Amino acid sequence: MLSQVCRFGTITAVKGGVKKQLKFEDDQTLFTVLTEAGLMSADDTCQGNKACGKCICKHVSGKVAAEDDEKEFLEDQPANARLACAITLSGENDGAVFEL
């Protein structure tokens, strides 16, 4: 019998100067974690499909994979801006900090 291994981690989200630690499971998007925590609204968005650019956040610290198909939404944004829906979380993101 195969056992399914699920990895967890924690990120910190900062909104309005208030820090909140949020747990995640591998392969969840940052968008999902933030909306489930009530820190980001899914209303009037593409629902995490990398098509609207409304879930921009700032990557403050920690490890995050390089941006890929989100560049068109980030052209006029600071260098640390990312789309929450384009960040798929894994154990390597444990401890990362994002500002909303």
From Swiss-Prot:
Record's CDD domains?
A: fer2
Q: Which cofactor does it need?
A: [2Fe-2S] cluster
The entry marks the following residues as binding [2Fe-2S] cluster, namely 46, 52, 55, 85
Gene Ontology molecular function: any one: 2 iron, 2 sulfur cluster binding
The answer to whether the entry has keyword Glycosyltransferase is no
Question: One GO CC term of this entry?
Answer: hydrogenosome
This entry's comment on the bound cofactor is: Binds 1 [2Fe-2S] cluster.
* Job of this protein: Ferredoxins are iron-sulfur proteins that transfer electrons in a wide variety of metabolic reactions. It links pyruvate:ferredoxin oxidoreductase to hydrogenase.
Other information = The propeptide may play a role in the targeting of this protein to the organelle.
Q: Where in the cell is it found?
A: Hydrogenosome
Q: Provide the alphabetized UniProt keywords.
A: 2Fe-2S, Electron transport, Hydrogenosome, Iron, Iron-sulfur, Metal-binding, Transport
What is the name of this protein?
A: Ferredoxin
Concerning InterPro entries, the annotation shows: 2Fe-2S_ferredoxin-like_sf, 2Fe-2S_ferredoxin-type, Beta-grasp_dom_sf
Question: Which residue numbers delimit the 2Fe-2S ferredoxin-type domain?
Answer: 9-100
Q: Which residues form the propeptide?
A: 1-8
